Amino acid sequence: MSTNSFFAKFLRFIGIVLMALTGGFTFLGGVGTFCAAVFPQKYESMAGLIPYQWLYILFMLGTIAIGVWGIWAAIKLIKGTTDAYWMSLYALIAGVLVGGFHIYMSRMLRGKSMPVDAVVYTTLLTLVIFLLFKIPMIWQGVDFSKAKASDNKKAGGAAAILVGLFTLTIQYTMGSTHTWGGVNYADAFNTSMAVIGIGLLLLGAGIFVSLRNVRETALRLQVQQ
């Protein structure tokens, strides 16, 4: 498979977008564990977590760290660095292991584990796809370090917009699993999430605008020649 073939570009695009979404989702999942980790005594459904509060604080910090790791890996994929793929793979494996243990403990202590499940299943899907990328025939074309920077930047722009939209709507998409006593705690960091979400939307739009300007400039130079 050629590095510049449509299929190779498509797979790289999917890989970068999925990695960025997974990193962002994991980070937000870690932030969303704050209430259960720091104030389990405030919620009747979290009473079983009180003796293990220290563990849930570790889950929260670990998940946030893995989320940042995943986002950093996605940025490296966009830049096409030689260590980008393996960094992504290690971050995904860490996410599955820590998230899987989190699911096990939550189901054992309080009988359910949502929304951790959604984060782990997303991470597992991305991990499977990245493992498939390493099949020799596929990797020959997908290899992120050999791609044109402009192709990867398109995926980066799309990823920034999608993560931005997800950040802006997290209080609605996760409201059902974060509502106790009629209060939606997924909306606890509304201002911060709004600022981050809008910032990501502007970043994504800016990337596409800059790529368009570069393309138009290149076309004008060709015409002049």
Language-model-detected regions and their locations in the chain:
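Topology signature of small-to-medium multi-pass alpha-helical membrane proteins
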Residues: 1-225
